[in-house]
Amino acid sequence: MPLELVQGDIAHQPVDAVVTAANKQLMGGGGVDGVIHRAAGPRLLQAIRPIGGTPTGTAVITPAFDLERQGVKYVIHAVGPIWRGGQHGEAELLAGAYRESLRLGVENGCRSVAFPSISTGVYGYPLDRAAPIALATIQDFLRSHPDLSVRMVLYGADALHVFERALAQL
């Protein structure tokens, strides 16, 4: 299945690359990023330090380190926007973070990528507004990359239902 919605732990997915919702400094944090950094181990932070950061709406890729034991090859660090009311280019920046993550995955030979819901935690992006952007961006990318499979890994049943409704409306 090219696009799948699941409820679960993003750090335990059978995929080639796991996307983390990073901050611009790429230095690890709470939420999904903290989970991925803990699962990948301290070498992830050592690998990301020299990069120094990346702008909102972009992504960078590193080895998966300790996640490689589960078959994950890469961690893709996507920087989504902080929600500021929706009139500051947030939708374009969010789509860019998804698109750049997918591009990096394909460029590095990944056949499967797992995403969290980027920017909907501490960055405050409303889930019902983020879901259609995420799913439309992913589906658009998959049209030109049919061999790629994408798994949206959502934390909690409420988030899963929001994404299921958004997918049904696309």
Curated annotation (Swiss-Prot):
It holds the Pfam family Macro. It comes from the Bacteria. SUPFAM superfamilies: Macro domain-like. Residues 1-170 form the Macro domain. SMART domains: A1pp. Belongs to the MacroD-type family. PANTHER family: GANGLIOSIDE INDUCED DIFFERENTIATION ASSOCIATED PROTEIN 2-RELATED, MACRO DOMAIN-CONTAINING PROTEIN. This is Macro domain-containing protein DR_2288.
